[in-house]
Swiss-Prot record:
This is Ribosome maturation factor RimP. GO terms for biological process: ribosomal small subunit assembly; translation. The keyword Cell cycle does not apply. The keyword Ribosomal protein does not apply. It is found in: Cytoplasm. Required for maturation of 30S ribosomal subunits. It comes from Anaeromyxobacter dehalogenans (strain 2CP-C). Pfam families: DUF150_C, RimP_N. Signal peptide: none annotated. One of its GO terms (cellular component) is cytosol. Keywords: Cytoplasm, Ribosome biogenesis. InterPro entries: Ribosome_maturation_RimP, RimP_C, RimP_C_sf, RimP_N, RimP_N_sf.
Length: 171
């Protein structure tokens, strides 16, 4: 199809692939459609219990490539990349916020959000320890204060890998 926007292609790919990947035991974490170094690239980020390895990425690539070819809704030639979401995994669904409770996260809102914690000013960014998802809001501990950020106000949320903490645990 001509004239499909970048976001629309990612949404269509998600709708097409999510049920297939779930059937095979994978979670479709994110889909990116972007022009990189002059070429279109479709990135599919997957996860599963226990983590994702190179064999998983190859298997998913072999599964989804023919599905995308048959659907044939992406007009320009593109490269397909399948990978794990990485150490800074995005968090989107309510279950993501419960699954990673106890981990350090960074949350960014679409705009300033007031009243996320008693006496706190309106803010757009939070970094703290994720407590979970309750009553339509993400809860996180920021320097000892519990903040509740409405899920529909979150533009982006990611795990934050603590390199220093990991190194301390290895000593």
């Amino acid at each position: 199809m001509t004239g499909i926007g970048e976001q629309s292609i990612a949404e269509q790919v998600r709708s097409l692939l999510e049920p297939v990947l779930e059937r095979d035991g994978y979670e479709l974490v994110e889909v990116e459609w972007a022009r990189l170094a002059g070429r279109w690239t479709l990135r599919v980020f997957i996860d599963k219990a226990g983590g994702v390895g190179i064999d998983d990425c190859q298997a998913v690539s072999k599964t989804v490539e023919p599905i995308l070819d048959v659907a044939d809704f992406i007009e320009p030639a593109y490269d397909l990349e399948v990978s794990s979401p990485g150490l800074d995994r995005p968090l989107r669904k309510p279950r993501d916020f419960d699954r990673y409770a106890g981990q350090r996260v960074h949350v960014k809102a679409y705009g300033p959000v007031a009243g996320t914690a008693p006496g706190s000013p309106a803010r757009k960014h939070w970094t703290g320890v994720l407590k979970g998802f309750r009553d339509g809001a993400v809860e996180l501990d920021v320097d000892g204060a519990l903040h509740r950020v409405p899920h529909d106000q979150i533009a982006k949320a990611n795990l934050e890998y603590d390199v220093e903490g990991d190194l301390r645990r290895k000593d």
